[in-house]
């Protein structure tokens, strides 16, 4: 009789090992041809999808950066254009102000010239009137002197002086 060795509880029994090997031989090809390829395909598809999303995000990020740069450039151009427009407006305002001053100066000069001409005309008319008045008074004085038949030069001078004084009073 052989001594039976005691059974180790940690090791499976021989029938369990044989049954497990048969089940594994049946199930392993099924997993190898059907389940593993599907899982691999699913993981590959998921990986491709994630990589596609990452590349889309990268291209969207690149487009966003390009758009940002474009907007910055447009903003800089708009600022430059606005600055140029403001400068042109200042220049135009200075030109308009200068033209207005020149027009005002020309108008003032014309008014002054017209006033001088009017003063000269009135002065000439006053002188003409004064000469006419003096001539009339001189004739009147001469007529008076002749009518009184003055013999004396002294009296004649007094009469002329009185006539001139009267003329000065009438003129003033």
Curated annotation (Swiss-Prot):
Keyword Ion transport applies: yes
Record key words, sorted: ATP synthesis, Cell membrane, CF(0), Hydrogen ion transport, Ion transport, Membrane, Transmembrane, Transmembrane helix, Transport
Cellular component annotations (GO), alphabetically ordered: plasma membrane; proton-transporting ATP synthase complex
The keyword S-adenosyl-L-methionine belongs to this UniProt entry's keyword annotation: no
Any single Pfam family the record assigns to this protein: ATP-synt_B
Cited InterPro entries: ATP_synth_B-like_membr_sf (IPR028987), ATP_synth_b/b'su_bac/chlpt (IPR002146), ATP_synth_F0_bsu_bac (IPR005864), ATP_synthase_B_chain (IPR050059)
Coiled-coil spans in chain: none
Membrane topology: Single-pass membrane protein
UniProt cross-references to CDD domains, sorted A to Z: ATP-synt_Fo_b
Subcellular location: Cell membrane
Top-rank lineage group of the source organism: Bacteria
Regions that span the bilayer: 17-37
GO MF terms, alphabetically ordered: proton-transporting ATP synthase activity, rotational mechanism; proton-transporting ATPase activity, rotational mechanism
Family per similarity comment: Belongs to the ATPase B chain family.
Subunit structure: F-type ATPases have 2 components, F(1) - the catalytic core - and F(0) - the membrane proton channel. F(1) has five subunits: alpha(3), beta(3), gamma(1), delta(1), epsilon(1). F(0) has three main subunits: a(1), b(2) and c(10-14). The alpha and beta chains form an alternating ring which encloses part of the gamma chain. F(1) is attached to F(0) by a central stalk formed by the gamma and epsilon chains, while a peripheral stalk is formed by the delta and b chains.
Entry-linked HAMAP family: ATP_synth_b_bprime
Role of this protein: F(1)F(0) ATP synthase produces ATP from ADP in the presence of a proton or sodium gradient. F-type ATPases consist of two structural domains, F(1) containing the extramembraneous catalytic core and F(0) containing the membrane proton channel, linked together by a central stalk and a peripheral stalk. During catalysis, ATP synthesis in the catalytic domain of F(1) is coupled via a rotary mechanism of the central stalk subunits to proton translocation.
Protein name (record): ATP synthase subunit b
Organism: Tropheryma whipplei (strain Twist) (Whipple's bacillus)
Gene giving rise to this polypeptide: atpF
